């Protein structure tokens, strides 16, 4: 899967773009841009940042893909993103509401009841659920813990299809439906959806690796090829991912595949285990700062603007009010920080120079250009930062006291001593380069 830190370029893709069908182009999309009905499904077609997103509504349940359900609240987030009347500031505050990861990289669960399964099949189901847990946790920081009294957890039910809710949501129980009880990797696939992981073919950079022609897909299946723009993909596109579909999936005619490689060749899927890319993706999505083990980790914060410039405590001073600046990369403690969880999704960013001092929005400011400084931790909202995991594009940071603003390098300048400030988001999905930072663990 290689979930989602570096922008890739593809000249070959640019040459091919003019001759392929593209769901983002209204001229080549045969589905009318409105809500349509198909048998028992209502198909919602939403235009988000110039690209179409499909959601199938069936009996009041929203399907973001054939096997991914989203809550009414998540559907509302998509509608707000698609609404041209929604301001950029409002969009920037809701973008993190669509998919959330599990706190402390811990997923609580309950095992299924036997239901209509024979004793033999029921035992097989239980065994393979545990194999799926082991498969995921064996090379990641994820923990699966049997529920006691937790409010948010996952459950399993044997049904006639496979599906899972997408990501963690407060006060929600994620009911995972499983038909293929004899395949641990398929169960793992659905668990990974509950962890907040999308299908590989939905990466926004997919067009650098594959050609997708949704006009060859059966009616009502286009939601399986939605582009998820909030996450840039981690590492290279992974054809061996357990989250990847094959060329002919959902095709009207198997001789006319929906997806091919750039050279026109086809590919198959595998459901035997997680790939190296899947493990790397999980470890990025749930790290470096989402995992409990990372609380004591130390990181540098490099700007995406340049490979040799880091966030820096000016003059290595620990005096309250010391400026946070951009400076040439070094190994000094003035460029090393630890992340400590405060609220779900929010972190304090401590200086290694003095762990009682944290990155703070000056004077609790909420206006564009307000400086960021070092100050004694008082547990205020101006000292808590919401992290946006952007995969290959690094991380974005929003202060809790001003959620519509983002940590940025002032004016996008890479000169030494440039102030680090909070600024208005100028893009609704992926932040601009000056608002993206690469976290590198140094010990």
Feature-to-residue mapping (PLM):
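Sec-dependent N-terminal signal peptides
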Residues: 6-11
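Extracellular interaction modules
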Residues: 151, 237-238, 274-279, 330-334, ...
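C-terminal motif of bacterial Sec signal peptides marking the signal peptidase cleavage site
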Residues: 15-18
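Surface-exposed turn/loop modules enriched in turn-prone residues
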Residues: 319-333, 369-378, 423-428
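Zinc-dependent metalloendopeptidases
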Residues: 20-293, 300
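Short, solvent-exposed loop/turn segments at the edges of secondary structure
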Residues: 171, 205-207, 238, 332, ...
């Amino acid at each position: 899967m290689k979930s989602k830190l570096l922008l890739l370029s593809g000249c070959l893709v640019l040459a091919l773009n003019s001759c392929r069908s593209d769901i983002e182009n209204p001229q080549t999309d045969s589905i009318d841009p409105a809500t349509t009905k198909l048998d028992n499904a209502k198909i919602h077609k939403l235009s988000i940042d110039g690209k179409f997103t499909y959601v199938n509504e069936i009996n009041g349940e929203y399907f973001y893909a054939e096997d991914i359900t989203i809550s009414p609240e998540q559907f509302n987030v998509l509608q707000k993103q698609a609404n041209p009347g929604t301001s950029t500031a409002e969009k920037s505050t809701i973008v993190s509401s669509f998919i959330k990861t599990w706190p402390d990289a811990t997923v609580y669960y309950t095992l299924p009841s036997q239901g209509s399964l024979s004793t033999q099949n029921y035992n097989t189901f239980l065994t393979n659920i545990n194999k799926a847990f082991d498969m995921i946790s064996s090379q990641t920081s994820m923990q699966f813990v049997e529920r006691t009294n937790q409010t948010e957890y996952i459950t399993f039910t044997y049904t006639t299809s496979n599906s899972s809710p997408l990501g963690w949501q407060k006060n929600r129980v994620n009911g995972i439906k499983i038909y293929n009880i004899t395949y641990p990797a398929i169960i793992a696939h659905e668990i990974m959806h509950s962890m907040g992981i999308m299908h590989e073919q939905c990466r926004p950079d997919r067009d650098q690796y594959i050609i997708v022609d949704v006009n060859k897909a059966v009616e009502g299946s286009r939601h399986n090829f939605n582009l998820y723009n909030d996450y840039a993909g981690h590492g290279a596109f992974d054809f061996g991912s357990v989250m990847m579909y094959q060329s002919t999936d959902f095709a009207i005619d198997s001789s006319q595949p929906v997806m091919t490689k750039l050279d026109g060749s086809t590919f198959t899927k595998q459901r035997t285990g997680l790939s190296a890319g899947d493990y790397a993706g999980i470890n990025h999505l749930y790290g470096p700062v989402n995992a409990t083990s990372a609380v004591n980790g130390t990181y540098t914060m490099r700007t995406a603007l340049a490979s040799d410039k880091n966030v820096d405590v000016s003059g290595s001073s620990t005096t309250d009010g010391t400026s946070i600046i951009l400076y040439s990369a070094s190994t000094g403690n003035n460029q090393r920080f630890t992340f400590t969880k405060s609220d779900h999704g929010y972190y304090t960013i401590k200086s290694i120079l003095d762990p009682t001092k944290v990155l703070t929005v000056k004077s609790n400011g909420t206006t564009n250009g307000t400086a960021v400084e070092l100050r004694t931790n008082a547990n205020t909202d101006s000292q808590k930062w919401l992290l946006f995991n952007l995969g290959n594009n690094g991380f974005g940071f929003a202060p809790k006291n001003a959620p519509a603003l983002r940590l940025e390098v002032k004016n996008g300048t890479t000169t030494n001593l440039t102030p680090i400030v909070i600024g208005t988001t100028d893009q609704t999905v992926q932040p601009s380069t000056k608002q993206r930072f690469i976290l590198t663990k140094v010990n």
